[in-house]
Amino acid sequence: MNLPRAERPRSTPQRSLRDSDGEDGKIDVLGEEEDEDEVEDEEEEARQQFLEQSLQPGLQVARWGGVALPREHIEGGGGPSDPSEFGTKFRAPPRSAAASEDARQPAKPPYSYIALITMAILQNPHKRLTLSGICAFISGRFPYYRRKFPAWQNSIRHNLSLNDCFVKIPREPGHPGKGNYWSLDPASQDMFDNGSFLRRRKRFKRHQLTPGAHLPHPFPLPAAHAALHNPHPGPLLGAPAPPQPVPGAYPNTAPGRCPYALLHPHPLRYLLLSAPVYAGAPKKAEGADLATPAPFPCCSPHLVLSLGRRARVWRRHREADASLSALRVLCKGSGERVQGLRRVCPRPRGATATCSSDHQACCIPKPLPLCCKCPPPLLLGQFCSNSSSIRRTAPTAALPPRARCWAGTCRPRRRC
């Protein structure tokens, strides 16, 4: 009679058992495997609860494609059952700060730096601005340039210096401040097509004055002096016309004035020297040129007419731009070299006086050797200053020897 087998605790493993027939029995190990699976499940649940509490309450973190999923998806099989539900509950990772800043940055304006500078200058009532004023206008008008301020400020400075369409205006002494003003060249106002700043016609270049170009005189010339400088001299009875503007000069300049005053190439006042200076002149001054004498205010109409005839004859034998040549005079008594200049005037009809009495302001200079006893005067034309007073004087015989010498009546002892 077989007795019922007492159940042993599962914790103790069953070793080899023998039945009544003496055969070995099978070992029961299923109970141990179930216990191990339960322990692993409990450990995994504890780990998941810990992660859930540390990260976010109510969500179960699982590594499925690197995306956080709700707990019900993990418990239901690990994957989303409904695609629409997955799309609604899916949360994309946050973007970086740089990407968000690029998305909010405004677009760059389609204008060149020259167009931006032109806009800033034209909107000013005085049509001029400093560099800081131009940069302030651009940054206030276009938000794109508010962030990259140092970079485009250097570009503005280079465009102001390298383009001829912008003119630098120095700051006036009575206006304190820093930096010069910048304005537009008046000839560059049409460099944009139809006033649109999007397209420029061509690069503006300021006209350069040629070296041989004659600039207008800074002051109007008298009629007699203009006859000497005119390439086609004629009767000039009235005031000379205002000089024509030179191409490339500023159009806003008033007639008779130029932006930079230039004197005659050889002013007479620099060549009128005293007698000792003439006596001590070096030998290299023998071929030096003398300038055209400065005009004198005493000129009558008939003398101007005769001057035109004499000037035409004079210019046939001389070049238009040639100056007068000096003479070399060797005086026998002193042995010094003296440069002299004699004025020969056209003698009007009925005039009996010599050159000293009829000498006018518009005389044509002509070189003539001087006599040995008569030193040159301190100033040329000192006997020709006033024609009205000289005509009332005595004839040539009553004049002093020096005056008669310069008038041409005395004959030198020996021609040098």
Curated annotation (Swiss-Prot):
Keywords: DNA-binding, Nucleus, Transcription, Transcription regulation. PROSITE patterns: FORK_HEAD_1 (PS00657), FORK_HEAD_2 (PS00658), FORK_HEAD_3 (PS50039). The keyword Zinc-finger does not apply. Residues 1-29 have a biased composition (Basic and acidic residues). Residues 1-55, 70-105 are annotated as: Disordered. GO terms for biological process: anatomical structure morphogenesis; cell differentiation; regulation of transcription by RNA polymerase II. GO terms for molecular function: DNA-binding transcription factor activity, RNA polymerase II-specific; RNA polymerase II cis-regulatory region sequence-specific DNA binding. The keyword Ribonucleoprotein does not apply. It is found in: Nucleus. InterPro entries: Fork_head_dom, FOX_domain-containing, TF_fork_head_CS_1, TF_fork_head_CS_2, WH-like_DNA-bd_sf, WH_DNA-bd_sf. GO terms for cellular component: chromatin; nucleus. Residues 30-45 have a biased composition (Acidic residues). It comes from the Eukaryota. Residues 108-202 bind DNA. This is Forkhead box protein D4-like 5. It comes from Homo sapiens.
